[in-house]
Each structure stands twice: as C-alpha cells, then as structure tokens.
Amino acid sequence: MYIRISKTDKIIGWAASIGIGLTILVADFLYLWGSPLFDDYIIFALIEICLIPAVLYFLEHRWISGCDDNIPLLLRDLTEAQRAGLPLVRAIEEAAKREYGPLTGELKKTANQITWGIPFAEAILNFGERVGTVLAKRAARLMVEASRAGARVHDIFEVITNSVQEMRNLELERKAEMMPYTFIVYVAFFVFLFITIILTNIFFTPAATYAFMSLTMVEESKVILFRMGMAEAFLSGLVAGKMGEGAVSGGLKHSVIMLTIGYIVFIKFVGVF
C-alpha cells in the first residue's frame, strides 16, 4: 500500500515533532537539571523530533519510487496496445484498468478526464503534475509530443519507453553506487561504540579498581563518551542520508536508528548512568 504525503502533512508532522520535542526539553531543563536522567531525556527529545519526519520522508520516498518504477511499465503497455491496433486514447483507457502501484489512481483520473472531453495533451500533462515526480513530468511531456507525430506513434512510444527506462536505470545505479558510503558511515559508528566498550570495560573500570582513576573520573569519562556518541549518531545519520539518498532529510531515519542503537549500547554495555 502506498501513501502519498502532501506538503501540509509534512508541515503538520514537523510542527508536531518539534512541539513535542521542545516540550520534553523544557520539562527536562526545568525538572531534571542535574539529575542522572537529564541526558536521557535530551536523547528522547531528539529521537522524537526526528521520528515523525523520518516516517513521512520514508512514505514519500516509497511513493516516488513506486511511481518511477511503474512509469516504464505503463509506457511499455501503451506501446504494445498501439501495436495491437488500439488508438492512444483507447490504450490509456485500457491501461487504467490495470495495476500500476501508486500510478493506478492517477491514471484512472486521466482516463476519466479524457472521457469527459478534456483534450488529450492537457489530461496527460495534468497526470504528470499530479504524480509530481521528475520522471513522470518528463514522460508526460514526451507522450504529448509523440501523440502529435501522426503515423507510427507506437514506434515513437517505443523510443520514449526505452529512454524513460534508461533514465530510471541511471537513477537506480546512482543510488546503488552510493550505498557503500552509507554502509561506511554505519561501520564508523559501530567502531566508535566498540572502542568505547573496550575503553570502559578493560581500561577505565580496572583503573578505578586499582585506584589509578577515581570512580568519579570514570563516570565522567563515560558521560563524555555518551554525549560524543549521541552527537556522532545524529550527525552521521544526516550524512548517511545526504550521501545515500541525496537529501539530508533522508538521513533522519538513520539518525533515529543510530541514536536508538547507541543509547541501548551505552546503557547495557558501557554502564553509563
């Protein structure tokens, strides 16, 4: 199931996240200042601020990917229908009866508009605008130009289909090439966590036992490492999103994941707080 996220949804999501997060932060500073739980609630607030926008971005990205994956399939079916002798308008009406993921609803609207007498070019351009992806808009413009070509429209549509498929393949290849960089960001974060566990359990704790370090110094060191780890988790997540998906907002989910993992590791294996 695909869910389309509007600009209004994103504004409401950000407003709700920031509002709840700021409420947690204000309460934290007012009631937990100096408490062992002070840092915990800062992390909870940060996760809350990132969580809803991360979910909205994921749903939006899923919608866009679903549309762009199905556009070449739609064009290919339109090409085959025209080869079989169907006029372009009739081919679109038949395609509207099939399943093309998130494109299905918009395609049905386009078929209805054509049936109601709206010019073909206008209906197709409206389709591209409603879907809203760069690939959909390009495909819509190419379809309009092809419809004006006259004879052998199906040959032109075949060229368009191949062109659009190539554009989609290039985009997927770019994302695949950037995935290793996202992986490197995660590896760097996990290396930091591993080193922290080694330091605290093999060096700091024995040092306190044999009086080389005071217990206060050990606890302060753990808190410093915790804060460094949480800062790295948040910022590394944003970097992973920028490198892997080309958008900082795409890194919010990585930030949430790293913050959650980092918090659990520090509580369970480092013994902070």
What annotation goes with each model-predicted range?
Residues 1-84, 97-102, 165-273:
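Hydrophobic alpha-helical signal-anchor/transmembrane segments
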